């Protein structure tokens, strides 16, 4: 896997080519000061609220104390930075997409941080919702700090222009998502995306699902992407229509789900579990969770306790506790 392969999987690189096949989205350049704020792990205060304060002066001593904290050594004002111009652009984009969006950066979405949202979802209605998820996500941090991890070429890292991607919110059923692996422009493997759960309809319809995905690949994807080795995710709705969700590099940086990268790179053990007729047609390997016995824990569970929250639970950082309680109150007011 080379750095150019990673660059080709940026959302803004492929979206113009496949716009008609995927969910409506808006791409906004990410200002440097917003990037700096997202990478700053020194505060849990979340910026991006759309409603300005009703007054500039506190009405009471209690309110003043709520805003400013001091000790014998120094005085610190716990206020979040504001980005009025960017906030306006984001809110306009959210409104144009129906009022709710699924956010991501150039490559990754903050799937590991869904638990921190008040609705335990990646559904966002404001910039503050997005900031909360992004600042809590290791996936987002990796996009910023290690976008070319596992790349084999030694060339200098390209200068990155980061983007906020807002996708129209759609209620997607996890059991209808699949990851597809393409090598030398040939579809070699399909995996159930949510492999931690057993879905009876997948086991019963796997040949039909595989055939449907193959048809979609041959008609819309094959020889049209910028590389010949890549991974793409799709969603198959209740009518059998296939939607393109994302592209990912063909390499270890991408989760191989029910395959191993040794299998995918070498091509061994990739015979599909289908009828002889399907095998004769060179069907890709199709893997799904075959019974409830093989159900596994969610891979995102390990991300659920960041150090900030350990500090909260032990009472070791009073400022972070104050920040979190303010954030919760503000979000309730927004609702």
Curated annotation (Swiss-Prot):
Q: How is it modified after translation?
A: Phosphorylated.
Which cell locations does it reside in? Answer: Cytoplasm
Keyword annotations for this protein, in alphabetical order, are: ATP-binding, Chaperone, Cytoplasm, Magnesium, Metal-binding, Nucleotide-binding, Phosphoprotein
Tell me if Ribosomal protein is a UniProt keyword of this record. no
> Per the UniProt entry, what are the Gene Ontology biological process annotations, in alphabetical order?
eukaryotic translation initiation factor 2 complex assembly
Query: Key word Zinc present in the record?
Result: no
**What is any one of the record's Gene Ontology cellular component terms?**
cytoplasm
Q: Which GO terms describe its molecular function?
A: ATP binding; magnesium ion binding; protein folding chaperone
Residue numbers binding Mg(2+): 246, 248
Write out the residues that bind ATP. 104, 107, 109, 111, 167-170, 177, 179, 193, 233, 246, 248
**Signal sequence interval, chain numbering:** none
Q: Name one Pfam family in it.
A: D123
Modified residues annotated as Phosphoserine in this record: 60
Which InterPro entries does the entry mention?
CDC123 (IPR009772)
Protein family per UniProt: Belongs to the CDC123 family.
Q: How does it assemble?
A: Interacts with the eIF2 complex gamma subunit EIF2S3 (via C-terminus); the interaction is direct. Interacts with the eIF2 complex alpha subunit EIF2S1. Interacts with the eIF2 complex beta subunit EIF2S2.
| Stated role | ATP-dependent protein-folding chaperone for the eIF2 complex. Binds to the gamma subunit of the eIF2 complex which allows the subunit to assemble with the alpha and beta subunits.
Q: What is this protein called?
A: Translation initiation factor eIF2 assembly protein
- Source species, please? Bos taurus
Lineage of origin: Eukaryota, Metazoa, Chordata, Craniata, Vertebrata
């Amino acid at each position: 896997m080379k750095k150019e392969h990673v660059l080709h999987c940026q959302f803004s690189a492929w979206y113009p080519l496949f716009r008609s096949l995927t969910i409506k989205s808006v791409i906004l350049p990410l200002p440097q000061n917003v990037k700096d704020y997202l990478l700053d792990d020194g505060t849990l205060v979340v910026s991006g609220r759309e409603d300005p304060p009703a007054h500039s002066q506190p009405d009471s001593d209690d309110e003043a104390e709520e805003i400013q904290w001091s000790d014998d050594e120094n005085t610190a004002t716990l206020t979040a930075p504001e980005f009025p111009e960017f906030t306006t652009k984001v809110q306009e984009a959210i409104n144009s997409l129906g009022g709710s969006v699924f956010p991501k950066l150039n490559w990754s979405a903050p799937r590991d941080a869904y638990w921190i949202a008040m609705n335990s979802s990646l559904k966002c209605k404001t910039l503050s919702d997005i900031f909360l998820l992004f600042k809590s996500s290791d996936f987002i941090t990796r996009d910023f700090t290690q976008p070319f991890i596992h790349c084999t070429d030694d060339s200098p890292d390209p200068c990155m222009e980061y983007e906020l991607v807002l996708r129209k919110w759609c209620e997607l059923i996890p059991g209808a998502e699949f990851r597809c692996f393409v090598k030398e422009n040939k579809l070699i493997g399909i995996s159930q995306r949510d492999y931690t759960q057993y879905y009876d309809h997948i086991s019963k319809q796997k040949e039909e699902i595989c055939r449907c995905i193959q048809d979609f690949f041959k008609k819309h994807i094959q020889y049209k992407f910028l590389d010949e080795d890549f991974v793409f995710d799709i969603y198959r709705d209740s009518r059998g229509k296939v939607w393109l969700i994302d592209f990912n590099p063909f390499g270890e940086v991408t989760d191989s789900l029910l395959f191993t990268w040794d299998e995918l790179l070498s091509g061994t053990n990739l015979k599909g579990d289908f009828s002889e007729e399907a095998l004769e047609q060179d069907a890709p390997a199709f893997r799904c969770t075959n019974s409830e016995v093989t159900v596994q824990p969610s891979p995102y569970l390990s991300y659920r306790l960041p150090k900030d929250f350990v500090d909260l639970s032990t009472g070791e950082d009073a400022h972070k506790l104050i920040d979190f309680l303010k954030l919760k109150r503000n979000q309730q007011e927004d609702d």
